[in-house]
């Protein structure tokens, strides 16, 4: 790096500076090594564990550091015994610019064509000030969020969790834990108890699908005119107002068609494994996985399903043919107070121009997913922990030794044979029912639009995209209240209608103005795209330490990867356009 800037939260002693400026990673590490060993030192960087960390450590150093991670994300690296590197993006789930006014990024930082790109000697005081402002924004965001979190959980010295989902869950537990899930012991201590059959949770786990995203039939890659996109305000928080399965009151039910219809009539939560048959004129919307991708247009269903979608299916053209497994539960309002309190708080903050409303938004949107946290296999990469494990006589019964690469030259790491990391917050029937309710809400609005003659081209979790509306108004409940719908406009635009749009596939579409200029490009997984999937596009990323270790390459290096759509890329068409 050209330089690194660090700002302490505050000056803890008279010799501490307000900011530290380092010209290389070695200088910063030398400073870190002199920090008092009797304290914990936590360093935050935004998206830091995928980018900034490589300014300090090489591939092997990162491999050898103890870490907290899931298969795709490192939440924390530990350096020595008392220094921790955490990624603020896991708490502040938006670009840093969302939390404060940033300046314009100097071109020499990001543009390889700039004559000063990579030239350390070209760094000016203005460049340093740009980065200083970044660090100020991050420091203020983290300290403000921590103060709010301490207030919400009622603990003066509470430290921030690693992720926004964990933060939301702890706030919910501290303020809204159901009293019926707690009891007092003979010693006067309050104990919290949740117990359920794992078999019931596993069934719901198989019914846990994400948001529905699709281009509607015969419209993929077709240019449509006068497009409009409507988003539902706070889709998941709005659905969390409903009743959900009570984990302490889960029972196995007689797996029969008659029992399902009785549970449906009673309006209680239930789930199971079902076989359904589509009838003519019925709605096609049930989730399935086909070729490892979500598919919503099947005319038969055989799998796990939660009660919101099954109830809707039975009311809209589907017949229940067989019940293979059935669970029921008593309903409980788990989140109503939580959602209403924080939604009202956010509205009040927005009304007063209080920027802290962004943190409340994070809290509202992050909670439900925590109940769907997956079990994970423990992965140990650092030599010290591996050595301790392998000194045990029976370590091979618990762990599998895996090579970093096929030639075994890059070393080994350990993976537990069983999923040993089991989140205590996990209860899949809740998470699966919330997402099921959201998909039903989406489908009911799509069906209403289609019934009234509107053309639906695309949907994504909480949004519906229409085209060629004419003067008709779609049947959404328009407004700014929780659960109402609102019109999405391109950034910086006041127009209601997008003159032309092309939807290629999930998470990939382009909006254009009347002059053919692109006003919005959505292309997931591709950072540098012009929105035309018939051409090769470029994704710019940073090589992570795992990839570097496997391939024997340098970590932290910018990588340009050519991305070609399997469905849309056409070499001949590209040649024609060039000629």
Language model features with spans:
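Conserved acidic
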Residues: 2-579
